[in-house]
Amino acid sequence: MRTFKKTNLRAWQQSALDKFLATKPQDFMAVATPGAGKTTFALRIATELMEDRTVERVIVVVPTEHLKTQWSSAAARVGLALDPAFSNSSAVNPSMDGIVVTYAQVGMHPFKHRAVASARRTLVILDEIHHAGDAKSWGDGVKEAYDDVNHRLALTGTPFRSDDSPIPFVQYVDDGEGHKAVSYTHLRA
């Protein structure tokens, strides 16, 4: 059985990880301030799911090119090999655990990304998911590409958009009040 490097988690990360692992839902959103550890949290979920063979591939979707390398480097530190050089004209490197792509890449060729995601049991991490509505093609592409994946983990510090566009895979329920799932203070972040 393959094992990954486990780092100590902050209290909010451990609480959210426990909540995720209890049910392993198709959709899960982590909302946390910048610097709170969303990347670390997401990579822990990825390694847990890879380790227990719930998923066989990890795809990370980011808003900008420079974040592709950042995510790949962070993943390498926990033993997860994510290819930041994957392009819409290349094949998936079979020696890698997954890929890191931009929302723009997915928007340009959603059917290619759908094929990559559906070829194996997949976790898709949608970093800064609120950006998926920045260009209509980004949100539409993400929905087309990842509608049927096993697990989607959305990360954001901003769980809403100023233009009121819906964020893909976020369920909106107008109940007049919000409900927290996991909370933490700035000090605990």
Question: How would you describe each model-predicted region?
Answer:
Residues M1-M29:
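Conserved pre-motif I regulatory segment
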Residues P25-R44:
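Walker A/P-loop
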Residues T33-P34, D148-S165:
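Conserved helicase ATPase motor motifs in RecA-like P-loop NTPase domains
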Residues E56-A74:
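Conserved Walker A/P-loop ATP-binding site and its immediately adjacent core
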Residues L80-S89:
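Conserved RecA-like helicase motor-core motifs
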Residues S90-D97, A104-A119:
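Conserved helix/coil segment N-terminal to the catalytic DExD/H
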Residues V116-H151:
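SF2 helicase catalytic motif II
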Residues T185-A189:
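Conserved small/polar residues in nucleotide/adenosyl-binding loops
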